[in-house]
Amino acid sequence: GVDTAIWDLRGRLSEKSVAELLGGSPGSIRAYGSSMRRDITPYDEAIRLKSLRDSQGFDAFKVRAGAEVGRNQDEWPGRTEEIIPTMRKELGLDVELLIDANSCYSPKRAIEVGHILEDNNFCHFEEPCPYWELEQTKIVTDALKIDVTGGEQDCDLPTWRKMIEMRAVDIVQPDILYLGGISRTMRVVEMANKADLPVTPHCANLSLVTVFTMHLLRAIEGAGKYLEFSIEGPEYYPWQTDLFSNDP
């Protein structure tokens, strides 16, 4: 909070955006629609995402696999095996598809799910194994062609250094607020740039973290393809209402 507030103050005093202070410029950013829900059937999720594609212009979406820190258990039996082909069938080949396992799987199970994802042209497999088990995640990364991603939970810079040096993931996902602000996030960005790893920050709700991430993505080298943009409204995150003059 303090770090991002200081960056905001610097921008106000200099009459520049934080993106400019970081060496970038204001402008457009491609966003993917990020679903947070596991309590929804694959077909109903597909209908929801198709509506957003048609009404809001999203051309990429992320859905959920497994149960959160689920020890190989699904939200209900068979949901993961159903949601992957259902998303591709219903949304077509023109939409990029991402998926988040939220630390659900052992390496063996993650690789099995990863092959299903590859068969259905998904492009991003997030946090397949318990996030603190970097060696497990690296096994999955090395076994699959799909991009394996992670890092949202990590706030310890030595852990980031280890993750990047061992190439535990293909894409790093720092969360500006979990990590402690713009300044510490830029240190992770520098590490990732040296290792030639893209940076696609985590920002899973429509709080100020999304605003901060917009500025970051417009400024950094090695920025990933997307801004994560939550599609969940007040029924899921009631505290989001009226945070801004104009709700996103």
PLM region spans:
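N-terminal capping/lid subdomain adjacent to the active-site entrance of alpha/beta enzymes
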Residues: G1-L98, N102-I111, H115-D119, W239-P248
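Conserved, mostly hydrophobic/aromatic
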Residues: V2, E15, F61, D100, ...
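Short alpha-helical "patches" and their helix-cap loops
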Residues: K16-G27, F125, G224-Y236
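Flexible, glycine/charged-enriched surface loops at secondary-structure junctions
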Residues: V18-L21, R64, E127-Y131, C203
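Active-site-adjacent beta->alpha loops and helix N-cap segments on the catalytic face
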Residues: L21-G23, V69-M87, S106-R109, P128-D142, ...
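Hydrophobic faces of well-ordered beta-strands that scaffold small-molecule active sites
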Residues: A31-S34, D59-V63, V95-A101, F125-E126, ...
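Residue-level marker of alpha-helix boundaries and capping positions
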Residues: D39-I40, G78, C104, E127-P128, ...
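Shared catalytic-loop signature of beta/alpha-barrel
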Residues: H115, N121, W132-P248
